[in-house]
Amino acid sequence: MSDRIAQVTRNTLETKISVSLNLDGAGKGVFNTGVPFLEHMMDQIARHGMIDLDVTCDGDTHIDDHHSVEDIGITIGQAIAKAVGDKKGIRRYGHAYVPLDEALSRVVIDFSGRPGLVMDIPFTQKRIGQFDTELFWEFFQGFVNHAGVTLHVDNLRGHNAHHQIETVFKAFGRALRMALEKDPRMEGIMPSTKGSL
């Protein structure tokens, strides 16, 4: 298997971001973003997706976390698209249900080349610590637009907002892992009857 690794740098007047990842890693996460709760969530992506993920961000968090969170999602999406390459041999689709105590979430992903986000998380709180829960939409929208995936995210139940979003990110990591696994029966084959994605 050829290395499925990528490094992407994205610099704007609002953020300076670097992402390095290995899709066939050991689930190691290294983060320095100035947004601690997002780092906790990205660690779930790395561990449950078995992706080595290194993210640094110097953003305008003195204003708020919006630009950093959205731009990190964009840059991770770009890096995954780069690492996946032509998509030949991958399973393409992934899904996962993950519980955490009273919370349960489902994530379904398709590496279709068609960006689309359907997300329903009825948060029980507007903030988790200092983190604005509305920003998770910005993270996933940025990711979807630049990874070129269709993503359905549903929190099916939960009373604790931290549990709600943690189950989402764990399920997201596991769905990514499933979709990006190489299928030995599909070696060199595009997972689409169209012949392209």
From Swiss-Prot:
Signal sequence span is none
Enzyme class, one word? Answer: lyase
Would you tell me the protein name for this molecule? Imidazoleglycerol-phosphate dehydratase
Q: Which GO terms describe its biological process?
A: L-histidine biosynthetic process
Its keywords, alphabetically, are: Amino-acid biosynthesis, Cytoplasm, Histidine biosynthesis, Lyase
Family, as annotated: Belongs to the imidazoleglycerol-phosphate dehydratase family.
**Pathway given in the UniProt record:** Amino-acid biosynthesis; L-histidine biosynthesis; L-histidine from 5-phospho-alpha-D-ribose 1-diphosphate: step 6/9
What EC designation does it have? 4.2.1.19
Q: Which SUPFAM superfamilies match?
A: Ribosomal protein S5 domain 2-like
Per the record, the domain of life is Bacteria
Where in the cell? Cytoplasm
Query: What is catalyzed by this enzyme?
Result: D-erythro-1-(imidazol-4-yl)glycerol 3-phosphate = 3-(imidazol-4-yl)-2-oxopropyl phosphate + H2O
CC terms in the record's Gene Ontology section: cytoplasm
Cite the InterPro entries for this sequence. Answer: IGPD_sf, ImidazoleglycerolP_deHydtase, ImidazoleglycerP_deHydtase_CS, Ribosomal_Su5_D2-typ_SF
What's the source species for this entry?
Cellvibrio japonicus (strain Ueda107)
Entry's Gene Ontology molecular function annotations: imidazoleglycerol-phosphate dehydratase activity
